[in-house]
Amino acid sequence: AITYRSRPIFYSLQMPWENDWLNGPATEAACARILSLIGVQATAIRATEGGCCGWSVVVAIKKRAGEGKNAISALLSLPVVKQVIVTDDDIDIGNPDEVEWAVTFRCQADKDVVVLSGLKGKHVDPSVRPWDLKPGELPTTAKFGIDATIPEGIPAFRYERIVPAFADSVAPRDYL
């Protein structure tokens, strides 16, 4: 039978991918486990929504020398993780502005960005161009990590965030 509606709703969005939200805790648990195995003390781990709760991870650590990049290497070894940002534990990784601030002011791209090429990829990642692969061919990808921790040998106070006086008591909407 052919049916129709007099006032149909055309659903043109992609499905909500409930599995992405369900993957978040599992990804965070896998990250916690691998960091524990290499002796890095994570204080917070977040699989971000923008990275479909698995492809992109932000981690705050209690850092010792070399641990920022060690954490990046370990986390990028996880099959689905493609992008990692590691910060010190003074950064609220649930606040994208604080994470961006840490990347902007605690990172030098030539020293603190790690790029690994030729790693195993996933067919669902359009950046690996799965449509160009031959049947049975596995995709490879590049993954990267950003070490947004305070560099070793520099006092932490040099990297403290400066908050303008009275910033909490002023509401911009009062002046618009």
Give, region by region, the residue ranges found by the protein language model.
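Charged, compositionally biased interaction regions
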Residues: 1-176
